[in-house]
Amino acid sequence: MSGVCHSRRQALYGLAGLLASSPCLRAAQAPELVGEAPGRMTPIDEFANVPEFEEMARRSLSERAFRRIAGGGRSALERITFRARMMVNTKALDLSLELFGQPMFAPILVGPASRQGQLDSDGELATAEGAGAAKATLVTAERSGTPFAKTIAAAPGAWRQFYPDSDVGALSERIQAAVEAGARTICLSLGEERGGRAGVPVRYGWDVLEQLRDAAAVPFVLKGVMQPADALEAAHRGIAGVVVSNHGTGQAQGEAEPVAVLPAIAEAVAGRIPLLVDGGFRRGGDVLKAIALGATAALVCRPVLWGLAAYGATGVQKVVEMLQTELAKDMVQVGAVNLAAIRRDHIRIHSR
């Protein structure tokens, strides 16, 4: 870990000690923004939580642009609450992990999104700079307005996401070019379309996925897995990991939220490969919930784009660091000193 990463971790340790010794383990959540004058941009240091950035993004964008990044399904996450545990020494709090051989400060990755130039003039480059400043691993979309070489210079260790292409050979070449440019992991988003007939997604069989896995020569991850059988087959086929996500099926009407299907997938995979998950993450505690359900880490996208739209790279950094700090606080609440200590019995799932 770098010196900056070490100092930030020390700050989290201090926070953990303070919370653990406090008679009030966790302060009440700050209220949402109220009484703001129309168009006024709140100073970034005044934010109490990540959801407040959504309103600032709305004020910064056209209605059409804002609709792209608004909302997101959260009902499954909101049905989960924590079970607090006292008398646990959490002064040595540690959020770090190693994923596909890559050390990470926390289990919070910045998820991929295309056309970020519609949100901020610096687009994906600003996101990369903010993610890099927050020591978060960035997953970049192939349909990016910023050359990958610039992105990875700002966010070392970045991953590259690709989409199925009817020309498998051309896709293999693009994957290899990304790896040569420094991509640490390749992610293929299932169900997306490139090079196929209009409105008809390109679907790959396992033979093609294995071919692309071999072309990557770095960890190869599938994004868009929602079925336990698919995740288990991926593990058997030598896929490095999967992202539980409904993006791969086009978010069809009635589609389950990723967190809702995560436990069944985790049970089927039984630790054979890492499981990542996206969808609806707004608070650091949401990430803790996902880990308790079997995830290794979470991809966060929309809130990062709110920060980008309102404050550029600084907003991205602030959003990610707030999520990291909230995760630390909530780990203290449940008595988990590190990610391996997070268990299913730290949470309760309510029926409604």
Task: List the model feature ranges, each with a label.
Residues 1-19:
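N-terminal secretory signal peptides and thylakoid transit peptides that target proteins
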Residues 108-111, 138-140, 158-162, 186, ...:
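Hydrophobic faces of well-ordered beta-strands that scaffold small-molecule active sites
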Residues 148-155, 179-180, 235:
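Acidic (Asp/Glu)-rich catalytic clusters
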